[in-house]
Regions:
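Glycine-rich phosphate/diphosphate-binding loops that line cofactor/substrate pockets in enzymes
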Residues: 11-21, 133-136
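N-terminal active-site beta-alpha-beta segment that forms phosphate/nucleotide-binding
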Residues: 17-67
């Protein structure tokens, strides 16, 4: 059984200082037994990154749609796991106003980092919260999950304007703003006619990321984890898809020649 201090030591062993901006996708079950359970996991993260910015995805794409269009950041539950919903209840945590792909954070300049998402019309709009990870030296920590849960790669594809990733027609949604007013939002969703779950193909990039040292294998609790450098991940994807922008979905595998020039 892991204690809070042991979990914090594992974060230190990853080479993280606690001053970074870190987005964590997680599976609580994969972490194993923890003294105090999920609350202790959150305590470890919040305390360790107390001088940085801790971010968790709080997506609502599963339950906010044309039939159920109203997103209320104070009430709409996250559809991406136990820890994310518990995080939303913590004092000091701020949630963005993106109606389908919100993010919550606590720490250094959290409100500033999360601001403006109500103006986006795609899941991971260039310049938005996911894309901002690149400009601040941000990391993505995948705890017990793989790149199929790495939302940052969706943002990379949006920045690089990869075709056939978004619906042509937007959904009309509504956002309950912090002051209680309602803002209409016209949101395109992830869509590919041949692959209903685009992110499942992101695992094809795993070896490229490891070879290029954009991603390292680490451990948190019992969980096998991947620690990703956002800018380095962006560069690997950019090189890999340059000859064929749709290859992550359309190719059964990606040839090593696509990333050999980046291997250090």
């Amino acid at each position: 059984m892991y204690t809070k201090e042991q979990l914090k030591k594992q974060l230190e062993n990853m080479g993280l200082t606690g001053e970074e901006t870190v987005l964590i996708h997680s599976s609580m079950k994969s972490i194993g037994e923890v003294e105090g359970g999920a609350d202790t996991v959150l305590d470890a993260w919040i305390e360790y990154f107390g001088h940085g910015l801790l971010l968790l995805p709080t997506h609502t794409w599963k339950n906010i749609n044309a039939d159920s269009p109203v997103y209320n950041p104070k009430e709409t539950p996250s559809c991406v796991g136990l820890l994310t919903n518990m995080f939303l209840k913590r004092d000091g945590v701020i949630r963005s106003l993106h109606p389908t792909h919100s993010m919550a954070g606590i720490g250094k300049k959290a409100a500033e980092y999360l601001a403006g998402e109500e103006n986006n019309n795609t899941p991971c709009t260039p310049g938005g919260c996911y894309d901002r990870l690149r400009s601040c030296g941000g990391k993505v920590l995948l705890v017990g999950v793989g790149h199929e849960r790495n939302t940052f790669i969706h943002s990379v594809e949006e920045v690089l304007n990869v075709p056939h990733r978004l619906s042509d027609k937007p959904m009309k949604l509504q956002i309950v703003m912090h002051d209680g007013s309602i803002k209409d939002s016209y949101m395109r969703k992830h869509y590919n006619a041949d692959q209903p779950h685009i992110s499942e193909d992101f695992v094809k990039l795993n070896q490229a990321f490891l070879d290029c040292k954009a991603v390292r294998k680490v451990t948190f609790g019992d969980a096998k984890c991947l620690l990703c450098d956002a800018q380095a991940v962006f560069e690997v994807v950019r090189h890999v898809i340059a000859p064929d922008p749709e290859c992550i979905v359309t190719s059964s595998s990606i040839p090593k020649e696509r990333w050999e020039a980046l291997v250090k």
